[in-house]
Amino acid sequence: MDHLKKYITEINDYPKKGIVFKDLNPIYKEPKAWKELMFPLQNLISTKKPDYIAGIESRGFISASALAFKLEIGLITIRKPNKLPGEVIGTNYKLEYGEDRLEIQQNIIEKDSKILLFDDLLATGGTAGAAGKLIKKAGGNLIGYAFLVELTELKGRENLDSNLLVETLIKY
């Protein structure tokens, strides 16, 4: 999958000084490149038989919704604060460049439903780790994590449940 790196733009000092942001938008506008990423994920995820894919705001929504549609399973959105109606469950966490909070609707997850967590990029693992804890807090059974890109030098896998699947397709 390394040949697909040519579609990933690097933007220095975004969103904060010292960060090199990996912009995946060019992949989404190239159907063949996006398809090449999505098919292996679709095949892998289908073997795990999740009830839902949970996508993390906002870039995780793009591929998570496409995968959920293709696999004919539900999509759960994990959002930043104050973006969801009704009662929510939330958790605070640390980012590579600060702190943030994630929330889901209180009754959106059926108890013990199998959920695969998806985001576009694994960096420090802070966001995905927090989202995984949130899924469990809401009563879901987290069965694994999938990402398009992993920044290996940041060792994000160390902040995820090591007993679960962690799949990434492009590594830096």
From Swiss-Prot:
EC number: 2.4.2.7
SUPFAM superfamilies reported in the protein's UniProt record: PRTase-like
Predominant place of localization: cytoplasm
Protein name, as recorded: Adenine phosphoribosyltransferase
Pathway info: Purine metabolism; AMP biosynthesis via salvage pathway; AMP from adenine: step 1/1
Pfam families per the UniProt record, alphabetical: Pribosyltran
InterPro entries the record matches: Ade_phspho_trans, PRibTrfase_dom, PRTase-like, UPRTase/APRTase
Gene encoding the protein: apt
Annotated function: Catalyzes a salvage reaction resulting in the formation of AMP, that is energically less costly than de novo synthesis.
Listed GO CC annotations: cytoplasm
GO MF entries: adenine binding; adenine phosphoribosyltransferase activity; AMP binding
Family listed: Belongs to the purine/pyrimidine phosphoribosyltransferase family.
